[in-house]
């Protein structure tokens, strides 16, 4: 598959494998990838990943691992054993944790991409202050993105509003995976830092994570095609 044609990652915000498969029945694996998060994976385990792969979807396993280096690396390799396209960790776990994950993936000759979460898109300045970080979200994102790049990972999860800044800071050979994407007229839901698909791509995002606007649409396929047309 051509990477440029797979910029959209559909978040499968489903509680069961049945519901997830009903969603992907209405999607085309040549037009998007899918994301399996904590709720779905906790309910269904690895079997849901395998089922999605049987339907020819590449899977981003969004479990945001965050633990001591060895434990995190073992979890990342376990995800890679499932054959997922991408998996993530929390950059706040630190350099040693991230470097250990990269080393283990290379040692195992895995093709799975590893990215890091910088600042959760639901968090604003006051939220960071609550956990002892008296800093603007964008400054923390820059700090953690730079650390992620230095640690050898493939990219970061970041708000589209930070994408342009990160491109200048880090360069082109680095994935910027962006949640908080809402087509024109959509509800912001619980994402604080949101941007439209077209603007996100213009700002330098490489992949757009879109959930409810597609999965809750009356016709998910038509919504997906509409979004693709808007960023073409």
Swiss-Prot record:
What is catalysed by this protein? orotidine 5'-phosphate + H(+) = UMP + CO2
Q: Which UniProt keywords apply?
A: Decarboxylase, Lyase, Pyrimidine biosynthesis
Q: Name one GO cellular component term.
A: cytosol
Cross-referenced Pfam families: OMPdecase
The pathway where this protein functions is: Pyrimidine metabolism; UMP biosynthesis via de novo pathway; UMP from orotate: step 2/2
Instruction: State the source organism's domain of life.
Output: Bacteria
Its GO biological process annotations read: 'de novo' pyrimidine nucleobase biosynthetic process; 'de novo' UMP biosynthetic process
InterPro entries named among the record's database cross-references: Aldolase_TIM (IPR013785), OMPdecase (IPR014732), OMPdecase_AS (IPR018089), OMPdecase_bac (IPR047596), OMPdeCOase_dom (IPR001754), RibuloseP-bd_barrel (IPR011060)
Indicate which residues the UniProt annotation says bind substrate: 13, 35, 62-71, 121, 182, 191, 211-212
User: What residues make up the catalytic site?
Assistant: 64 (proton donor)
Q: Which molecular function term from Gene Ontology is one that the record holds?
A: orotidine-5'-phosphate decarboxylase activity
Top EC category? lyase
| Signal sequence, start to end | none
State how it assembles. Homodimer.
Q: What does this protein do?
A: Catalyzes the decarboxylation of orotidine 5'-monophosphate (OMP) to uridine 5'-monophosphate (UMP).
Q: Tell me the protein family, please.
A: Belongs to the OMP decarboxylase family. Type 1 subfamily.
| Name the record gives this protein | Orotidine 5'-phosphate decarboxylase
Query: What is the organism of origin for this protein?
Result: Acinetobacter baumannii (strain ATCC 17978 / DSM 105126 / CIP 53.77 / LMG 1025 / NCDC KC755 / 5377)
């Amino acid at each position: 598959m051509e990477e440029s044609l797979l910029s959209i990652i559909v978040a499968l915000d489903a509680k069961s494998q049945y519901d997830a498969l009903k969603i992907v029945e209405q999607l085309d694996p040549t037009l998007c990838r899918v994301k399996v998060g904590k709720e779905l994976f906790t309910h269904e385990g690895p079997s849901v990943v395998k089922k999605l792969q049987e339907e020819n979807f590449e899977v981003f396993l969004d479990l945001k691992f965050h633990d001591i280096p060895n434990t995190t690396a073992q979890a990342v390799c376990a995800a890679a054993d499932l054959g997922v396209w991408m998996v993530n960790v929390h950059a706040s776990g630190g350099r040693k944790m991230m470097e250990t994950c990269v080393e283990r993936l290379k040692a195992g000759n895995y093709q799975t991409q590893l990215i890091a979460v910088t600042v959760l898109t639901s968090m604003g300045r006051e939220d960071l202050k609550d956990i002892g970080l008296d800093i603007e979200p964008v400054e923390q994102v820059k700090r953690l993105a730079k650390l992620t790049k230095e640690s050898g990972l493939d990219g970061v999860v970041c708000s589209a509003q930070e994408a342009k800044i990160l491109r200048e800071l880090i360069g082109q050979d680095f994935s910027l995976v962006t949640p908080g994407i809402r087509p024109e007229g959509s509800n912001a839901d619980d994402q604080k830092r949101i941007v439209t698909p077209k603007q996100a791509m213009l700002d330098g995002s490489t992949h757009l994570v879109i959930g409810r606007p597609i999965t809750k649409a009356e016709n998910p396929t038509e919504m997906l095609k509409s979004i693709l047309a808007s960023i073409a």
